[in-house]
Curated annotation (Swiss-Prot):
It comes from the Bacteria. Disulfide bonds: none annotated. Residues 1-35 are annotated as: Disordered. Its EC number is 3.1.-.-. The lineage of its organism: Bacteria, Bacillati, Bacillota, Bacilli, Bacillales. Optimum pH is 7.2-7.5. Poorly active at pH higher than 10 or lower than 5. This is 30 kDa neutral phosphatase. The keyword Hydrolase applies. It comes from Staphylococcus aureus. The keyword Hydrolase applies. One of its GO terms (molecular function) is hydrolase activity. Highly cationic enzyme that can bind human or rat immunoglobulins as well as serum albumin, and could therefore be involved in post-infectious sequelae.
C-alpha cells in the first residue's frame, strides 16, 4: 500500500472522539505557529 492508503485506513479506524481530539491538536499547532 502507498503511505496515503495506509493513512486513510488508519484514520478510518479512529473513533470520532479521537478524530475531534486530533482536529483540536492541529488547531493548537496552527495557533502556536502564528504566535
Amino acid at each position: 500500500k502507498s503511505s496515503a492508503e495506509v493513512q486513510q485506513t488508519q484514520q478510518a479506524s479512529i473513533p470520532a472522539s479521537q478524530k475531534a481530539n486530533l482536529g483540536n491538536q492541529n488547531n493548537i499547532m496552527x495557533v502556536a505557529x502564528y504566535q
